[in-house]
A protein has these predicted regions:
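Active-site diphosphate/adenylate-binding microenvironment
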Residues: 29, 33-97, 109-115, 119, ...
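Conserved AMP-binding loop of ANL adenylate-forming enzymes
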Residues: 131-175
């Protein structure tokens, strides 16, 4: 079917990509310009005064004056912003706070300013235009697109609105996409995930769906519901579905499952968005890496991951990075985050242009389903669960079980008990409740029936010692990781027959 929108998309894509090429071809100059603008604009803020921004001329000055901080370390400043104080981290007050699940100390409030907010929308748009420009495929813009996201309902605190990032972004969808966009506003506002998916399936089944977007674990559930309802592969139900857009977690563990659910291959675009900024998107179908966005009000620094915990690690700028090295990514942004450690590690796959893959987290974590569970959270959950019981725990580690033989995926807890234990079902339920209480993403995944509650697998006496010995890491400074985002340790434990 002829579509004017599809016809116009190609010249528009061509125009935007020509504009983008200017900074892509001048990466170092672009980053230097961003750096100077950020320092200049924030020199009159409380943070700028505390760190003598007025005398910062070069990156070396910045390194001397501004230490690396994570959210907890930046929190005293953020709390002042949340309380309604202007000119703290950035000029004026933020437009929004993206509220995200934090560590055990509660929710994180990430500011979004009038300067930073548009970049979240522009980057997503440009990812799609880049795909159109590269492939010549534009017919999909005439069909319906679904973005599986958080509720767009916002709350107010001290005159500033707050919500989930995906919910905030929903308010900024360009006019020309509004008619094509699904689900409806009413459905998007449903808080309960299972009810929401049912409503989305009902709304989308009769439509000409061409683009489906979201975190793979959520999309998988949507696809499975469609298959249950129709008895058909998703690619047969939606014959014109040809583009899957995703971000948030590693897609590789899902790829085979998705190809099976869809029944055929579809093109995909990987995005690298976060509340702290939209960092990169896949700009070439045959390239694994994502184009690092250098003109979006974010100044990047990179620290080799193996030196990150040194007393004074070297903070590299873009010109000094090398392909294939694991770096901790540090950002300074026009939302007022300064030398901020997002917690991600990246690896460059190319320097002409600069492309990255997300290689992991600087701390051990599990986020196979987008849950962002960190070591501190599992330790705290276990501590709360065994309080007042007779359980004595010698050692434990946690891994995701993405493809169980039956039922939903889950977190598998491998625990070695000091004492004799018969039944661990109640302990598992207690740990699960404590973890849900600490981590809102995990809570959503359990309540939305994307995950089933965790399961405990008991380990033989001294089993973990045997495991450490088998990998040549028994004793000394070697620690068993509390959790991993893959099943390397889990598989080895099974292979060594260390299950009780």
């Amino acid at each position: 079917m002829f579509s004017l929108k599809a016809l116009l998309a190609k010249p528009f894509a061509s125009y935007i990509i020509r504009k983008e090429k200017k900074w892509i071809d001048n990466p170092i100059e672009t980053q230097e310009q961003v750096f100077q603008e950020l320092i200049s604009q924030a020199s009159s803020t409380a943070f700028g005064a505390d760190h003598d921004f007025i005398s910062i001329n070069h990156h070396a000055d910045f390194v001397k004056r501004v230490p690396i901080r994570d959210y907890e370390e930046l929190k005293p400043y953020v709390e002042r912003v949340v309380a309604g104080e202007p000119d703290v981290l950035w000029t004026g007050k933020p437009l929004y706070f993206a509220k995200t699940s934090g560590t055990t100390s509660g929710a994180k409030y990430i500011p979004l300013t009038k300067e930073s907010m548009p970049t979240h929308v522009t980057a997503a748009r440009n990812a799609i235009l880049s795909y159109i420009h590269e492939t010549g495929n534009s017919q999909f813009v005439a069909g319906k697109m679904i973005f599986l996201q958080g509720s767009p309902v916002l709350h107010e605190q001290n005159g500033i609105q707050l919500g989930r990032l995906s919910g905030i972004v929903a308010h900024f969808v360009p006019e020309y996409l509004q008619k094509n966009r699904m689900p409806s506003w009413e459905t998007n506002c449903i808080e309960d995930w299972e009810t929401k998916v049912e409503a989305i399936v009902k709304e989308t089944l009769p439509e000409n769906m061409t683009v489906i977007s979201g975190i793979p674990s959520w999309v998988q559930m949507y696809f499975e519901k469609i298959q249950q309802k129709t008895g058909q592969k998703v690619g047969d139900v939606f014959k014109n579905f040809n583009l899957f857009i995703f971000g948030g977690v590693n897609y590789e563990p899902y790829r085979a499952k998705f190809e099976n659910l869809i029944g055929r291959k579809v093109d995909s675009i990987e995005l690298y968005p976060a509340s702290e900024g939209f960092f990169a998107y896949q700009d070439k179908q045959d390239e694994k890496g994502m184009l690092l966005l250098l003109n979006a009000g974010i100044f990047y620094e990179f620290i080799p991951a193996d030196a990150f915990f040194d007393a004074h690690p070297t903070r590299l700028t873009l010109k000094d990075v090398k392909i294939g090295v694991n770096y901790v990514m540090i950002i300074s942004t026009n939302a007022g985050l300064w030398a901020y450690n997002v917690g991600d590690t990246v690896m460059f796959t190319s320097t002409k242009p600069y492309r990255v893959i997300v290689s992991g987290r600087i701390k051990h974590f599990i986020s196979a389903f987008g849950e962002h569970v960190i070591g501190k959270e599992v330790e705290q959950a276990l501590k709360e669960a065994i309080e007042g019981t007779n359980f004595q725990i010698s050692e434990f580690t946690v891994a995701p079980q993405i493809t169980p033989e039956s039922g939903l995926p889950y977190h598998e807890w491998f625990i070695e008990f000091e004492n004799d234990v018969a039944d661990v079902s109640q302990l598992a339920a207690k740990i699960d409740a404590a973890l849900q209480n600490q981590n809102s993403y995990y809570f959503d995944l359990i309540k939305g029936r994307v995950l089933q509650p965790l399961k405990i697998t008991m380990i033989t006496k001294n089993g973990f010692q045997d495991y450490m010995k088998s990998i040549g890491k028994l004793g000394g400074q070697n620690k068993l990781p509390r959790l991993s985002n893959d099943r390397k340790i889990a598989d080895k434990i099974y292979n060594l027959n260390l299950i009780k």
